[in-house]
């Protein structure tokens, strides 16, 4: 007869070694049993607040089935268990790890990411076989020096913690290949990282770094360095010696100039957007023979050098939201360029419709714009048969009219456009008219004859004092250049130009911002610098939802209304050279984003 009462339970021989019952129930016996065979245990997302003792002692204690199965001929050979090499405890509610972790010396992979752990146990030094350690998304503020004993560690993920420093002992992880310390509170990086000569991937993004150690240049095997979203004002020259580097991310810092990278012949991607870089010179480009991606958005570049053509392998170039006014023709010679981003630049001289057609059409346009060698004296004296000669000895290029659909009569100092010019274009659907740099006092009346086809008109550098109704009938017009004239107002009839995307009115006589511009729905660019404008209407400007570039430099603006900060579509706002006191020059120097943020902060609440 049994000595236990009917329905009673035998005493548990492992009592005192088990975790609380609710934690043990979260780890089914079958999982532990399977882990002894496979050497792998995944306990992620089980709501654990602590790790059951049975997990730490999985390879120490005799399993319960040993007391039930003594058949050495059975298939379930509990004594042939495998050491635990992989333990995943991710996405639980753990606040600490037990020192009993030392009972798992065979661990190769330990993943405890997405918990609430504030520190690591000193016993982690016993995990000398560990190759991958993921402690990301926790609350760790400091790393123990015991980590230096993990001499086989290859991948160390620490992102999204609260680290304020990396210990010098980090340099002892001699075969480390991947180190991610992004999204912490690091203000500096120990010079000992220079000892990590086997590192391939180093992520320092989203910290508070103001400088990088010179020793970082010793990482000769590093392929990817990410320093995005820090406070870096410069990059150590030693970076130029990281000869294996393929990807360099320096976005969202405080860089005012690009580092010279003469030896980075393997560099494929350079990301330096959202900085304060003002110049890009040939010294920055001449040795980057493998570069395929160059990202320079949201900087203060005014000039793109012709040496950009040195980057023969370039596939993507992002120059959006800079201060670039023109593009070098050599840009058209890049054979592999597939994506060119230019939004938010005050570009002049290139029709908006060409920009809208995409990268390939723009490159084709630039390539076709390359200057041919000057004609010899004999060629000039005997123009080719493809030209039509007017009585004034001026030449109209018939090829341009027939093939490029362009009618040019510029730089002639003419007060009138000869009738023969219009007659030559009578049978062609002209899309572009250029009568700039003459002495015209009014818009030529016969321009209306092209109303069904023309979308780009350049009448800049003349003496025109008013816009005629004939010009207002060019309903397909997308680009209008009236710079350097004598205009003081625009007619309300211009509201009919609903397709107009870009207008240049700089160097005229405007004392008021033309009201009619507020009514043109597709305007993206307004360049109206160097006039005498005294005020603007931010409410009306906010309604211009496509307006991305507004140049109001060198006017008479005594104040900038805070509500202008609500014009969220603006990507390039230029206000320099006006007599207002605020925003101050230091704010203006930071660029459009900073200006708009400042203005919004001044809106009364």
Swiss-Prot record:
InterPro entries with a match to the protein in the record: Leu-rich_rpt, Leu-rich_rpt_typical-subtyp, LRR_dom_sf, LRR_domain-containing
PANTHER family documented for this protein: LEUCINE RICH REPEAT-CONTAINING DOMAIN PROTEIN, PTHR48051
Keywords assigned: Leucine-rich repeat, Repeat
LRR repeats: 83-104, 106-127, 129-151, 152-173, 175-196, 198-219, 221-242, 244-265, 266-287, 290-311, 313-335, 336-357, 429-450, 453-475, 476-497, 499-520, 522-543, 546-567, 569-590
Any Pfam family matching the protein: LRR_8
Protein's recorded name: Leucine-rich repeat-containing protein 40
Gene Ontology cellular-component terms listed: cytoplasm
Sequence segments annotated as region (Disordered): 1-21
């Amino acid at each position: 007869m049994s000595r236990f009462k009917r329905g009673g339970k035998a005493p548990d021989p492992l009592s005192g070694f088990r975790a609380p019952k609710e934690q043990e129930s979260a780890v089914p016996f079958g999982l532990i049993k399977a882990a002894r065979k496979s050497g792998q245990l995944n306990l992620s997302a089980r709501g654990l607040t602590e790790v059951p003792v049975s997990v730490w002692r999985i390879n120490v204690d005799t399993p319960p089935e040993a007391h039930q199965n003594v058949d050495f001929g059975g298939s379930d050979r509990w004594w042939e268990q495998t050491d635990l090499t992989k333990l995943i405890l991710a996405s639980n509610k753990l606040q600490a790890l037990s020192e009993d972790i030392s009972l798992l010396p065979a661990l190769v992979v330990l993943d405890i990411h997405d918990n609430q752990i504030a520190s690591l146990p000193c016993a982690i030094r016993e995990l000398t076989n560990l190759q991958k350690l993921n402690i990301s998304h926790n609350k760790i503020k400091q790393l123990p020096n015991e980590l230096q004993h993990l001499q086989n560690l290859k991948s160390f993920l620490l992102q999204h913690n609260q680290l304020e420093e990396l210990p010098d002992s980090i340099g002892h992880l001699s075969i480390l290949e991947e180190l991610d310390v992004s999204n912490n509170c690091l203000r500096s990086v120990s010079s000992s990282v220079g000892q990590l000569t086997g590192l391939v991937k180093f992520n320092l993004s989203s910290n508070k770094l103001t400088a990088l150690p010179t020793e970082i240049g010793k990482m000769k095997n590093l392929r990817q360095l990410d320093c995005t979203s820090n406070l870096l004002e410069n990059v150590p020259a030693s970076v130029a010696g990281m000869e294996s580097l393929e990807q360099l991310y320096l976005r969202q810092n405080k860089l005012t100039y690009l580092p010279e990278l003469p030896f980075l012949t393997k560099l494929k991607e350079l990301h330096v957007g959202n900085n304060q870089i003002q110049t890009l010179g040939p010294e920055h480009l001449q040795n980057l023979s493998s570069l395929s991606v160059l990202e320079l958005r949201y900087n203060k570049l005014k000039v793109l050098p012709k040496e950009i053509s040195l980057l023969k392998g370039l596939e993507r170039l992002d120059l959006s939201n800079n201060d670039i006014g023109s593009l070098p023709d050599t840009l058209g010679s890049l054979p592999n360029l597939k994506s060119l981003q230019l939004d938010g630049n005050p570009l002049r001289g290139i029709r908006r419709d060409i920009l809208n057609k995409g990268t390939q059409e723009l490159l084709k346009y630039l390539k076709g714009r390359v200057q041919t060698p000057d004609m010899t004296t004999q060629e000039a004296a005997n123009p080719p048969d493809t030209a039509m000669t007017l009585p004034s000895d001026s030449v109209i290029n018939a090829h341009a009219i027939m093939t490029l659909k362009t009618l040019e009569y510029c730089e002639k100092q003419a007060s009138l456009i000869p009738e023969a010019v219009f007659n030559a274009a009578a049978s062609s659907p002209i899309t572009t008219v250029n009568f700039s740099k003459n002495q015209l006092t009014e818009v030529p009346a016969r321009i209306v004859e092209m109303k069904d086809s023309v979308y780009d008109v350049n009448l800049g550098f003349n003496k025109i004092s008013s816009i005629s109704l004939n010009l207002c009938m060019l309903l397909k017009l997308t680009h209008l250049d009236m710079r350097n004239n004598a205009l003081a107002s625009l007619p309300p009839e211009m509201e009919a130009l609903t397709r107009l995307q870009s207008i240049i009115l700089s160097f005229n006589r405007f004392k008021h911002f033309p009201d009619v511009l507020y009514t043109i729905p597709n305007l993206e660019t307004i360049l109206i610098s160097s006039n005498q404008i005294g005020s603007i209407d931010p409410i009306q400007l906010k309604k211009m939802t496509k307006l991305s570039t507004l140049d109001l430099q060198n006017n008479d603006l005594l104040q900038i209304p805070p509500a202008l900060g609500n014009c969220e579509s603006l990507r390039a706002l230029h206000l320099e050279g006006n007599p207002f006191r605020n925003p101050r020059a230091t704010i203006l120097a930071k660029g459009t984003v900073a200006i708009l943020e400042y203005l919004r902060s001044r809106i009364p609440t």
